[in-house]
């Protein structure tokens, strides 16, 4: 539970029966997640999003592109891809909307509006269409996000680490834009985090995943190159209470994610099986840390935040 959680739960209950006031809005925890493409919000932070929504927080997700360059899983929608009809971006808006609904978030928000910047593709792919997000003017992009920060006034902001998690140019650019926006905004963000993947956490998830589809390539945790060791992590969120919502959101991104029938693992277009862990990990970039457990980790991103 986060700080002032009892207040947040009472406010959530009152709003459910139509009672609201500006004072109540001021006391509700607000979290902003900034992601590069539709599906990133679910893969990296979906459990955390649903976890805090369930506890009465106001959660917003900003997505920087429509993911037009994504590879399409399966034949049903293969013709939407960039080398064919190039209509994948619009379809992924619908997928994102459904995924966010599964997580408890009302609607998507796109930086600059839907389609303002295009998915840049992987680092080794040609620049087939413009304007690519990786080429976005930093002042414009950071200014647009800073305006969102000043309007929404989040207590917590989450985005990727400097490597963008696994090196995708749009993830790296999202990190840069978010960092610049946090520095530029008039609103002083109390806590700023990177979403990361823990080697120990993924190792535990690999150990318990069962009934992986035969057609998927099975690897070990040692084959995953972008994981963080425990000494580099500052916070963990137990998302076991919201794992069903995360799995449902993954299934909503059907052009991008395959989910095992038992919901314990998933695969992208590369068909590499990855477990779906019941914990999500973070690095605290700025802001005062809250109480820590025996490992030295916070267990609540809102720990220590004054909501008043």
Swiss-Prot record:
One example of a Gene Ontology biological process annotation: mycothiol biosynthetic process
Cofactor dependency: Zn(2+)
Catalysed reactions, semicolon-separated: 1D-myo-inositol 2-acetamido-2-deoxy-alpha-D-glucopyranoside + H2O = 1D-myo-inositol 2-amino-2-deoxy-alpha-D-glucopyranoside + acetate
Keywords: Hydrolase, Metal-binding, Zinc
MF GO annotations: N-acetylglucosaminylinositol deacetylase activity; zinc ion binding
Entry's EC annotation: 3.5.1.103
Residue positions binding Zn(2+): 37, 40, 171
Domain of life: Bacteria
Cofactor note: Binds 1 zinc ion per subunit.
Protein purpose: Catalyzes the deacetylation of 1D-myo-inositol 2-acetamido-2-deoxy-alpha-D-glucopyranoside (GlcNAc-Ins) in the mycothiol biosynthesis pathway.
UniProt similarity note: Belongs to the MshB deacetylase family.
Stated name of the protein: 1D-myo-inositol 2-acetamido-2-deoxy-alpha-D-glucopyranoside deacetylase
Source organism per UniProt: Mycobacterium sp. (strain JLS)
Gene: mshB
